[in-house]
Amino acid sequence: ELSVDYAVVFQLRLPRAATAFVVGGMLGLAGVLMQILLRNPLADPYVLGVSGGAAVAALLAILLGWHMVGISGAAAVGALASMFLVFVLSRGRGDWATTRLLLTGVVLAAGWGAVVSLILAVSPDAHVRGMLFWLMGDIRETFPGWIRLGILMTSLLIAFGFARSLNLLSLGELRAESLGVNTTLLRVGLFFMAGLLTASAVTLAGAIGFVGLVVPHMVRLWGGSDHRLVLPGS
C-alpha cells in the first residue's frame, strides 16, 4: 500500500509540476513565434483571441455540468475554432497582412471577453467559482504526460528547423525575401504553430497570462537574439 507522502508527491505534486513546466514551455515558445510573426515585442500568445475562444467554450461546458475531460475538450475546440476564425477574417481579399491579423485578433479577443463577462453574470452561483478557478489557471491532470511533453517537443523541433529563417525574418521581410525565404508561407506556419501551442496550453491549464510575453525577453537578455538559442531557451 502506498504511503500518504508518496501519493502526495508522486501522484499529485509532481504531475502538476510537470504540467506547469510543459504549459510554461508552450506559452514561452508561442510567445517567441508571435513576436516574430507580428514584429511586435509586446505580442503574447493570447493576442489573437485563441484563449478567449477556449474560455467561452470551457465556461459553457462548466455551465452544462461537464466533467474535467469534457471541459478540456470544449476548450480545445473553442481555441481551434477561434484560431481558424482569425485566419479566415484576417485574409481580406486574399491578402494576409500582419496588421490585419493583429487587428482581427484584438477585436475577436475583445468580443470573447464580453461573452465571458456575460456568462459569468448570468451563471448560477454554484458554477461561478469553478469558472473563475478555470480562468485563473488550473493544472489538474487531464491528459497523459507523454501527450503533453510530445506536443511541446514536436513543436520545438519543428520551430528549431526554421531558426535561420526566423533570424532573417527578424531583420525585415524584404531582406528575408531577398535571401530566399518564402515569408508568406513562413508567416502562415508561424501563425498555426503559435495558435496550436496556445490552444494546447489553454486546454491543459486554462488562461495563464504573462509567461508568453516575459519569458522570450528574459532569454534574449541572457543569450542574445539568435533564435537557435531563443527557441529552446523559451
Whereabouts are the PLM-identified features?
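Alpha-helical transmembrane segments in inner-membrane proteins
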Residues: E1-S234
